[in-house]
Amino acid sequence: MVTRTRPVAAMAVRSRSSSRTGTAYLLLVLCEVSWAQIFSFPFRRPETCDFNQYFDISALSCAPCGANQRRDALGTSCVCLPGYHMISNNGGPSIICKKCPENMKGVTKDGWDCISCPSGLTAEGKCHCPTGHILVERNVSGSLLAQATCELCDESENSFTKANALGTRCVRCEPTFVNTSRSCSCSEPHTLTGGLCFSNTGNFHQRVISTARYGELGMSLNSEWFAKYLQATAAACWTHANLTSCQALGNMCVMNMNSYDSTTLDACRLFHYIFESTAGLISVHSVPFWRQNLPWLFYGDQPGLAPQVLSTTPLPTNFSFKGQNQLKFVAASYDIRGNFIKWQPLEGGVLQLCPDTERRLDAAYAFGTTYQQNCEISLSKLLVDFSSPVFYDVYLEYTDEEQHRYLWPIPVLNLNLQHNKLFVNQDSSSSKWLLTRRIFLVDAVSGRENDLGNQPRVIRVATQISLSIRLVPNTKNGNIYTPLLTIAYSDIDIKNAHSQSAKISFSVKYEMNQGDASVHTDIALGVLGGLAVLSSLLKTAGWKRRVGSPMIDLQTVMKFLLYYAGDLANVFFIITVGTGLYWLIFFKAQKSVSVLLPMPVQEERFVTYVGCAFAMKALQFLHKFISQISIDIFFIDWERPKGKVLKAVEGEGGVRSATVPVSIWRTYFVANEWNEIQTVRKINPLFQVLTTLFFLEVVGFKNLALMDSSSSLSRNPSDYTAPYSRILRYAVATAIWLVIGIIQVVFFAAFYERFIEDKIRQFVDLCSMSNVSVFLLSHRCFGYYIHGRSVHGHADTNMEEMNMNLKREAENLCSQRGLVPNTDGQTFQIAVSSQMRQHYDRIHETLTRRNGPARLLSSSGSTFEQSIKAYHAMNKFLGSFIDHVHKEMDYFIKDKLLLERILGMEFMEPMEKSIFYNDEGHSFSSVLYYGNEATLLIFDLLFFCVVDLACQDFVLASFLTYLQQEIFRFIRNTVGQKNLATKTLVDERFLI
């Protein structure tokens, strides 16, 4: 029966359970009970529980203790009240207490039994014994005595024992008591200090200064730690050569910043006294500054010793950028009492107060990686994490050829060290430095007054730690000198530890002697600068000939300076690009280290060169920019009226006949095309900027500018990112910019102009088809001529005749387009005579007497007619000049000499006749953007680099570079258009 009913009962239980679950769920849904109300509970701390409550670590709340119980010292369990002993204890609060009988009111130390006490009870209900006695509750076999006894420890010479601090057993007296007084007491004439007993007959210093000095705050305070332990520690070190005491004395000296004052008997003075007094002892590991039994704190105070330590002996090992390149720094660590803690590697952030991932912290010791870490830490955290300072002696571990492991000590430059009240380590001359050995990170002990349990009044923090690694000059195998650990401490007067903080920095920097590089740069600058002077003189001489001025005046000097600025800009550009690429290639590609990057301070000279290059290139750009928007230009219309076609014109004398005028639309069309090609370039500026930005930011070429040994373009986000080198950023940016620019120019010249569109040659062809020539004067007596005279005689014709003319020209059924018969030369450089220029100016003055082009509807008739007359006069004069009509202002055509082409100047002066030089290279583009692409490309590049050097942001540099390109292009178009309208009488409203 039982077995049959079990399934039914189980089903009933499951049914009732399901019903209850469904009901509960339905109630939750219908009542919309808040989950926050279900899962929230009161917040309790152990210290908030009552005297008879304990903190339940499971329920995280206060719970009552049992009868005759109270909470323990931790607050997480219960103990019996005084006068009660335990009869059951299952752990935690699960205890049962029972009252002791009247004749046995005391409770044993373990709390399980009651006992009769010989001399009173403590507040906890335990037996109490007088000073020097120990409490005995059990016999030798462990049986509980009926009454406890207080036994006096035997202090006689046979035992030398006394009660321990807990009063539970007799222990041997402290050795200094026994050795000094042959007893367990230290009375006159002996001295008791720091729990040790010393004899006055040792003639050791008695007036020890326990003051802790804080130079940054300009204050001193009486350190409880020094007052309590300094004299005892020094005496134990001096008298007994106690190793731990000597280490503790050294720690106290380090806590006082290794400062030494011959007039003050402080920790360092005591250490020096002991060091000098033990000169007869042997040196440790043959190091003259490391005396037996003493810690190695100083390298000595001889002048000039620091440079010998740092720059005389290279480390007997090599370093490379490939393979295992970690610097193995290790430290011997000691606690404040002088106990040796352990050997520990510096990996894991031992000396780095700023928190970070272990991977990033360990990157500080990757050889060749410049490391920089900064943070701000609250004083409350420092007080918790560094309640007691830890002291470190730092070494570099290396192996010899036989794989034997050795240690190389790392000297310390403590910037807070004072020698006879002088901060010698802050001097710029290393010969005055005093190197030390031991460091700590945080000292929150020496700043405590009166009681070591109090919060310190002052805390001393190592806020700046810098590890400097210097490469041996001319090394090929990665040899380095002894690294230098520079440390600076900040003294902080604690007001509110929770609101105060300390700014911490940790850095590793690499350096090498940059003297040779500076000399080579100076030589290159001197040689190229001299060549720039010669080039500028030649350009100035060529300019003087082109303006027809034989005198050297202020304008000549200013012109020379402008040319020199441009040439010197190229010199600085070449030097900076060469220098940048040198560091980029040789630093990143080396395996065995032979060069290291210049430090940020050493980069200032390079940045100055870049700034000079940009400033002078900007001056050259503005010079050319202004020259282009102020050129003299005129369109010569060769078109003549066809036959004697007449038309009726109404005048004052009635209706009369007149010749049909030549259409002006061809001239307007040519003027518009000229206006369009003024800012045509051989590259696409937007493509240039975006492509450069793409390679730098997206592909990751900017990672080559990081100051580490890696040449990878992609970096793991979890890895440490080294700071950027400004030299490498400049090198990478210039290399990418120039490569993209050169590729664009080559593509434009070799493909685009040849197969798609060549706007410069198209303009020359347009002039021929329009029967319009272009006369340009970029200087007073020098300019360019584009011969556009139609070989068909007329260009103002219909479509049929135009196509017929093109067909005849394609089939060579007409003469060639050149100025000289049977030639194709249409473009010329021209050097005009002064007489011709004067005649041009007389006509031009009439042409430009008005402030602007004629406003067709609003200008007065007389002004308009004068302009028309001047226009026709100029057109007639230039046309007749080209046709050799004026024998007194004639010209001849010749080829330029090779040397003239190379130097960019003319040897012959146009004295009586003007000179037309054949120009197949269309050099008239020099008055356009097109012919100054190199200047524009370098100016844009330098602008890009200067912005990046200032902001360290390629995106911002790209945006501002494109913005300035567009601004100058707009100004060039606008002002150039106005100049074109003014010089050619083409109404600006028709320039679209």
Curated annotation (Swiss-Prot):
Its main localization is membrane
Reading the lineage from the top rank, the first entry is Eukaryota
| GO cellular component terms given for this protein | cytoplasmic vesicle membrane; cytoskeleton; endoplasmic reticulum membrane; MKS complex; plasma membrane
Residues on Extracellular side: 37-516, 588-600, 699-728, 950-954
Q: List the disulfide bonds.
A: 49-62, 65-78, 80-97, 100-114, 117-127, 129-150, 153-170, 173-184, 186-197, 237-246, 253-268, 354-375
A GO biological process this protein is involved in? branching morphogenesis of an epithelial tube
Q: Which residue positions carry a glycan here?
A: 242
Keyword annotations from UniProtKB, A to Z:
Cell membrane, Cell projection, Cilium, Cilium biogenesis/degradation, Cytoplasm, Cytoskeleton, Disulfide bond, Endoplasmic reticulum, Glycoprotein, Membrane, Signal, Transmembrane, Transmembrane helix
Compartment annotation: Cell membrane; Endoplasmic reticulum membrane; Cytoplasm, Cytoskeleton, Cilium basal body
- Where, in residue ranges, is this chain on the Cytoplasmic side? 546-555, 629-667, 769-923, 983-992
- Deletion: any effect? Knockout mice die soon after birth. They show multi-organ developmental abnormalities including pulmonary hypoplasia, ventricular septal defects, shortening of the body longitudinal axis, limb abnormalities, and cochlear hair cell stereociliary bundle orientation and basal body/kinocilium positioning defects.
Location of the region described as Cysteine-rich in the Swiss-Prot/TrEMBL record: 37-280
InterPro entries from the UniProt entry: Growth_fac_rcpt_cys_sf, Meckelin
Q: One Pfam family this chain carries?
A: Meckelin
Annotated membrane topology: Multi-pass membrane protein
Q: Where is the signal peptide?
A: 1-36
Intramembrane stretches, as ranges? 668-676, 677-685, 686-698, 729-754, 755-759, 760-768, 924-926, 927-933, 934-949
Transmembrane stretches, start-end = 517-545, 556-587, 601-628, 668-698, 729-768, 924-949, 955-982
- What is known about its subunit structure? Homodimer. Part of the tectonic-like complex (also named B9 complex). Interacts with DNAJB9, DNAJC10 and mutated SFTPC. Interacts with SYNE2 during the early establishment of cell polarity. Interacts (via C-terminus) with FLNA. Interacts with TMEM218. Interacts with WNT5A. Interacts with ROR2.
Q: Report the protein's function.
A: Part of the tectonic-like complex which is required for tissue-specific ciliogenesis and may regulate ciliary membrane composition. Involved in centrosome migration to the apical cell surface during early ciliogenesis. Required for ciliary structure and function, including a role in regulating length and appropriate number through modulating centrosome duplication. Is a key regulator of stereociliary bundle orientation. Required for epithelial cell branching morphology. Essential for endoplasmic reticulum-associated degradation (ERAD) of surfactant protein C (sftpc).
UniProt disease link = A spontaneous deletion of TMEM67 cause the bilateral polycystic kidneys (bpck) phenotype, a disease mimicking human Meckel-Gruber syndrome 3. Homozygous bpck/bpck mice typically manifest bilateral nephropathy with swollen abdomens resulting from grossly enlarged polycystic kidneys and die by 3 week of age. Some mice also develop hydrocephalus, usually detectable within a few days of birth. Additionally, bpck/bpck mice exhibit retinal degeneration and tissue disorganization in the eye, and cochlear defects.
According to UniProt, the name of this protein is Meckelin
Organism, as annotated: Mus musculus (Mouse)
